[in-house]
Amino acid sequence: MKIAIMGSGAVGAYVGARLQAAGADVTFVARGAHGQAMQKQGLQIIMPGLDLHLPQVHAIDHPSALEPVDLVVFAVKLTDAMAAAESLKPVLRPDTRVLTLQNGIDSVSMLSEALPQAQIRGGTIYVSAVIEAPGVIKSPGGFHRVVADAAKGDPVMQALAALGERCEALDVALADDVARIIWEKFIGLSAFSGCTTLLRARIGDILSHPESTAFLQQLVEESVAVAQAAGQTVPAQMVDNYMKNLRAAPPSFRSSMSEDLERGKALELPWLSGRVHQLGQSLGVPTPAHTAVYRALVLYAKGQA
């Protein structure tokens, strides 16, 4: 199976590395020092008990050099999504599928503005990883999973699932109700990203104080309320279960958005707390905590030069 990774940052590179190790022919679209390092020395995954070193990977710095592929795994930050989609458009074959693994609930509709909607498949991903150094991805471990739209038996998605059965340290599943799963991730991620970014804190510090813990839980509750008002069915114990999962997470756990703020990069804020705020306004659901996050961080949303 021929796969391109569009957006080979920490998450994209991790997924691509595991798929290549399972036998896929993978092309990584990666820019800058990270992409150059991959071209020269391959790609390394550092993970407790599950290290992986691929001495040779095919890395290109622009999709214009992309050969025909069966699947594009679209893992670009939402801040760069439209530009990346436009750059992909000229080389996209009619039989190629584009699997978006981006955050938020809007990626399929966003990409549909630039790419044929019939070729786009929704999905979501659960991976904890950072770029430790150019060409080196570090993960603390844990459960890493891709969930993709089954798309009524689409053979490309079936091939991805079959490939996933051979993957180590990456579970690949297909779902008929992927929209629900995307919403469930959005509920938790919007709260977690908003809280860790606004407070400039890791989850262990947040949960060590009752007031910051209450703020995090309020964010989750608001996300649930908005989802329900939007017509989504949310598990009855979702708030309690999500808070329980965060208490079991490594104390150093924090969101990529908090890291982006620290580095002066553009933030996915408009598609996370900003989206909860917008939905709350349109649906008549109060979202004071998410509104506070959005308004407090909006000046940093485009990054700092």
Language-model regions, residue ranges each:
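Nucleotide donor/acceptor-binding cores
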Residues: 1, 70, 96, 143-144
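NAD(P)+-binding Rossmann beta1-loop-alpha1 motif at the extreme N-terminus of oxidoreductases
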Residues: 1-54
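Generic preference for hydrophobic
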Residues: 28, 59-60, 148
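Rossmann-like NAD(P)(H) cofactor-binding subdomain of soluble oxidoreductases
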Residues: 52-136
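Rossmann-fold dinucleotide-binding core
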Residues: 101-185, 191
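NAD(P)-dependent Rossmann-like dehydrogenase/reductase catalytic/cofactor-binding core
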Residues: 217-305
